[in-house]
């Protein structure tokens, strides 16, 4: 296994703290289901630092949210946040893509959009199945939660996460042409 660099560990810590604290805030759309802008953190940090960082930020951050909120840790949803973060970080594996350097193309943006959407759907279905099978939650309730959470996460991803990530890459692209004068 590769060692985690100090920079990556710090990024995971900051990302998890931001995701954990911002995860306490949201707009209710279904029973125990919220539109949470914090999901944008997973998109941005995943794109910046890769799938391992995205996974750990999702896992740790969601655990922080559940712990602070006091409703107990819902492991299916914690794992789903990790899955989403991992999916968002897959863009980092594309050759030539870098938010930090502002290097990307339309194919990269499409890849991030597709892997992000697929990751959200897989993660939320996993969380719902986990709640039914392991936690003994009623099927009808979970169907509503899964539909609500999927819609909410897709909205946040498309309205906040993706545009912020593209904006960061664009702003960094402007600086790639700068040269140091002697």
UniProtKB/Swiss-Prot annotation:
Q: How does it sit in the membrane?
A: Multi-pass membrane protein
The transmembrane segments are 9-29, 40-60, 71-91, 114-134, 142-162
- Main location per the UniProt record: membrane
What superkingdom does the record give? Bacteria
Q: Which keywords accompany this UniProt record?
A: Cell membrane, Membrane, Transmembrane, Transmembrane helix
Which InterPro entries does the protein's record reference?
ECF_substrate-spec-like (IPR009825), UPF0397 (IPR022914)
Can the keyword Cell membrane be found in this entry's annotation?
yes
Subcellular location per UniProt equals:
Cell membrane
Q: Which Pfam families match?
A: ECF-ribofla_trS
Q: Per the record, GO CC terms?
A: plasma membrane
Name the HAMAP family for this protein: UPF0397
Similarity field: Belongs to the UPF0397 family.
What is this protein's record name? Answer: UPF0397 protein BALH_2375
Task: Name the source organism.
Answer: Bacillus thuringiensis (strain Al Hakam)
């Amino acid at each position: 296994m590769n060692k985690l660099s100090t920079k990556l560990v710090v990024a995971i810590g900051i990302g998890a703290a931001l995701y954990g604290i911002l995860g306490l805030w949201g707009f209710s759309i279904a029973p125990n289901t919220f539109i949470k802008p914090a999901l944008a953190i997973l998109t941005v940090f995943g794109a910046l630092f890769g799938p391992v960082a995205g996974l750990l930020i999702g896992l740790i951050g969601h655990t922080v949210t559940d712990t602070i909120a006091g409703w107990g840790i819902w492991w299916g949803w914690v794992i789903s946040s990790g899955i989403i973060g991992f999916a968002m970080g897959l863009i980092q594996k594309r050759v030539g893509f870098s938010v930090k350097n502002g290097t990307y193309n339309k194919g990269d943006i499409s890849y991030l959009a597709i892997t992000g959407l697929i990751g959200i759907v897989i993660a939320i279905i996993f969380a719902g199945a986990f709640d039914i099978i392991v936690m003994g939650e009623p099927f009808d309730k979970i169907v509503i939660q899964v539909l609500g959470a999927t819609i909410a996460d897709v909205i946040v991803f498309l309205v906040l996460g993706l545009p912020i990530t593209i904006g960061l890459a664009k702003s960094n692209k402007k600086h790639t042409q700068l040269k140091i004068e002697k």
